Amino acid sequence: MARSLCFMAFAILAMMLFVAYEVQARECKTESNTFPGICITKPPCRKACISEKFTDGHCSKLLRRCLCTKPCVFDEKMIKTGAETLVEEAKTLAAALLEEEIMDN
């Protein structure tokens, strides 16, 4: 009886962990354009990334580059700048709205 109770507790905790993992938003990363040199500590990298309008930044482990992060929009793999990003996001949004309209009918 005690073993089955422990197993059930473990199973519930494992399920909660998997559900919480799937709920997290995807995080897009790109190398900083303004950070100079080798990235050793997080604070200067984070400051450079925030100045580039990202939400956070950290040093890559192997290449020691400053990587800027922000939540992905529409599951895009790459972060682009300027009008190109706006056009792609508008196309993706239009496709999503069209799909929703088709599914409702």
Curated annotation (Swiss-Prot):
Involved in floral organogenesis. May play a protective role in flowers by protecting the reproductive organs from potential pathogen attack. GO terms for biological process: defense response; defense response to fungus; killing of cells of another organism. One of its GO terms (cellular component) is extracellular region. Disulfide bonds join C28-C72, C39-C59, C45-C66, C49-C68. It is found in: Secreted, Cell wall; Vacuole. It comes from Nicotiana tabacum (Common tobacco). It comes from the Eukaryota. The keyword Disulfide bond applies. Keywords: Antimicrobial, Cell wall, Disulfide bond, Fungicide, Plant defense, Secreted, Signal, Vacuole. PANTHER family: DEFENSIN-LIKE PROTEIN (PTHR33147:SF128), DEFENSIN-LIKE PROTEIN 1 (PTHR33147). InterPro entries: Defensin_plant, Scorpion_toxin-like, Scorpion_toxin-like_sf. Gene3D superfamilies: Knottin, scorpion toxin-like. This is Defensin-like protein. Its main location: secreted. Residues 1-25 form the signal peptide. Belongs to the DEFL family. Flower. Found in petals, stamen and pistils, but not in sepals. In particular, accumulation in a configuration surrounding the inner reproductive whorls.
